[in-house]
Amino acid sequence: MAFNFMPKEVKFFDYLNLQAENIVKAADCFKAAVKQGLFDEETVRKIKDFEHEGDTLSHEIVDMLNRTFITPIDREDIYALANTLDDILDMINSMANRIKLYKLNANEDYMVQFADTINQSAQALANAVKHMHDTKRAPRAGPLHRGQRA
């Protein structure tokens, strides 16, 4: 019977990247709905689907953490990042639900600017997570850390 002392490579960065891409999709959907001023049942359901997918990814990441002895970065950092990414999706979902519930006029200028900021932040976050495993590119992951807009 042969033993494999090398741990099976777990793709934490791939799952975190999927979670970040999911945030971008939800932010894109939110931004489009704000620009159209349309938060109907279908739009809110789409955003809820992104949020549900994020919950699933977050649970999978936590399950992998519980089954993995050696992680590429500190396990608490992976856990915190996975939960924070899930929280972002929860907040986008909550905003969409409240806009629909209270029948707010989402096409106001301040809402459009807010949706643009959320979208730009989501894209910068996805870019940072995408390059997180590459330490050479990490300092140049995005312009937001320097206080600039993309």
Regions found by a protein language model. Give the residues of each.
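Cytosolic, long alpha-helical scaffolding segments
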Residues: 1-150
